[in-house]
Amino acid sequence: MKAYLATHFFDLFGFEGTAKIAERIREAFPQLELYVPQENKEINDKKNNDDIITDIAIYKADASELLSSQILIAYLDGVEIDAGVAGEIGMFVGSLETLKAIGMRHTPKIVIGLYTDMRQHGTGDNHMYKNLFVKGAINEWGCVVETVDEVIKLMDDFITNYPV
């Protein structure tokens, strides 16, 4: 079973937070092949390889891993959903919608959105908005949860019900 962790990781908190989420998932599922884009040095060692890391190289490396995964965990926090994360959600769900539209069966897959911001339950000025098209895509093929524990529970249920 393969999973893909889509997050923003270009600042200290994003990088360290992503590493902590990945660690929790790996502890819960040691047999799972978890791809975390920030760990792919071939496309992310910008200090030493910035001149050879291209947008196409990043796209090919990450898209290959994304499309071969059965589980997408998408981190949704931030003022906006990170553009890369939204693109990864779109590609993953789009591949499923295409197979569905042409009547082809596919390996079961799930999208789990992780949205931890406490303001999501606020009202008025205290409410945090997320794009409803993106949330709808997630909810059509999975759901949005608020904690890493809930992510792990959903992953456990999915892996139990759809072993590869």
Residue ranges and their predicted role:
Residues 1-164:
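Conserved catalytic or regulatory cores that recognize and/or transform ribose-phosphate-containing ligands
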